[in-house]
């Protein structure tokens, strides 16, 4: 299977984000560094109070908890309470800080870039805007990238869903 087009929201390439870590990024994305700690500490702390963990991560962004419907929050909490969920989340973040970085660097060293059209959008009030040149970073690892800043924080889909659809749908539906 092949990815034909990709929309990325409020993210820079992971290798660039780790290499460019500064105080502002570390404070905003503290959970990245918490989740990569060895088992079982992060899992135990998350599982002890999933609702508080969600509020600590999601509520710490510029919009707080306001963008999230109560039903959506309840579903996040339900899923985070399921056995194995915290382990899976931590495993994903641990991989992003280890083997994924090795693979990303190997691709860069080999001159391998993403070739599908990419549209990256990030929030004007978020850490990506404050800490990275997202468009430039994606252009280093992909051949066809467009991007823009949107009037929101990190949770683009929840904060400005109509604007996101107006931006993403024409791009995704463009047959070339």
Region locations from a protein language model:
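Catalytic histidine-centered segment of alpha/beta-hydrolase-like enzymes
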Residues: 152-165
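Flexible "cap/lid" subdomain of the alpha/beta-hydrolase fold that forms the substrate-access gate
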Residues: 2-149, 157, 169-176
């Amino acid at each position: 299977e092949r990815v034909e087009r990709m929309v990325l929201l409020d993210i820079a390439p992971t290798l660039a984000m780790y290499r460019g870590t500064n105080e502002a990024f570390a404070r905003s994305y503290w959970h990245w560094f918490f989740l990569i700690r060895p088992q079982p500490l992060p899992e135990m702390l998350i599982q002890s109070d999933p609702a508080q963990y969600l509020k600590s991560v999601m509520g710490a962004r510029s919009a707080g908890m306001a963008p999230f419907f109560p039903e959506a929050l309840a579903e996040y909490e339900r899923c985070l309470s399921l056995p194995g969920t915290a382990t899976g989340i931590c495993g994903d973040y641990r991989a992003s800080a280890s083997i994924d970085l090795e693979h990303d660097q190997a691709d860069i060293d080999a001159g391998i870039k993403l070739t599908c059209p990419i549209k990256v959008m990030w929030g004007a009030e978020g850490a990506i805007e404050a800490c990275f040149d997202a468009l430039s970073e994606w252009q280093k690892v992909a051949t066809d990238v467009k991007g823009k800043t949107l009037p929101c924080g990190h949770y683009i889909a929840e904060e400005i869903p109509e604007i996101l659809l107006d931006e993403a749908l024409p791009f995704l539906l463009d047959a070339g």
